[in-house]
Curated annotation (Swiss-Prot):
Protein name stated in the entry: tRNA pseudouridine synthase A
One example of a Gene Ontology biological process annotation: tRNA pseudouridine synthesis
Keyword DNA-binding: no
GO molecular function: RNA binding; tRNA pseudouridine(38-40) synthase activity
Catalysis performed (reactions): uridine(38/39/40) in tRNA = pseudouridine(38/39/40) in tRNA
Any Pfam family hit: PseudoU_synth_1
Function: Formation of pseudouridine at positions 38, 39 and 40 in the anticodon stem and loop of transfer RNAs.
Active site per database record: 52 (nucleophile)
Quaternary assembly: Homodimer.
Binding residue positions for substrate: 111
Family: Belongs to the tRNA pseudouridine synthase TruA family.
Biological source species: Wolbachia pipientis wMel
Annotated keywords: Isomerase, tRNA processing
Amino acid sequence: MRYKITVEYNGSNFSGWQKQQHSANSIQEKIENAIFNFSGEKVTLYCGGRTDAGVHALGQVAHFDMEKEFELYRIRNAINYHLKSIPIVVLNAEVVDDAFHARFSAKKRYYEYRIVNRYAPAALETGYVWQVFSPLDVNIMREAAKHLLGKHDLSSFRSKDCQAANPIRTIDDIDIIQNGNHIHIKISAISFLHNQVRIIVGTLVEFGKNRTNPQEMLNILNQCKRSAAGVTAPPFGLYLVKIDY
């Protein structure tokens, strides 16, 4: 039986989603252990979006196979019971066809990056936003972001450790929303390169901070090298919002 779960987590104190050889602090391993504790079965979780250390999720999706059958609410409640001291929560569980794969069946992924743009420290949101002290010109950021829409070679916006064979990606939408000193950057696409969202955000922040001509984004794209783009935004402002199937 194949089960699909939707998961919310605070990624602050984890090594990321993926289980690692020299660390027992991955989100994947915590959930796999919780499933074993209530079912007695060792399972392998496959996720829709592998988040890095410090990145949060509002709607991560994962699947796993079990021989035993359980009522869906019991799966959700049992996993949550064994995770009760950990900031990981299963929001929903459902049965899916054996052809379903959390990663390869995904149609679109949605990320959101949260910024607080003010000089006074963000006392209540530390660890959940990137605080940028210099004033940002959001209109310039929006104009620069338009050049990233569509299909491009995004070599300038991937980490040096990115293992993707093909740097071509299609960005469906970038929406920059300002509410007072809070700025949320929403990005959606079917797939992303490693650190792509964080590098895009870091680059847009530099545009907004330095009042750079938005047309300069085309030059960054065309150089196809990591050094052309801006800094990598810190992980703690990034949220995996949801995944469409």
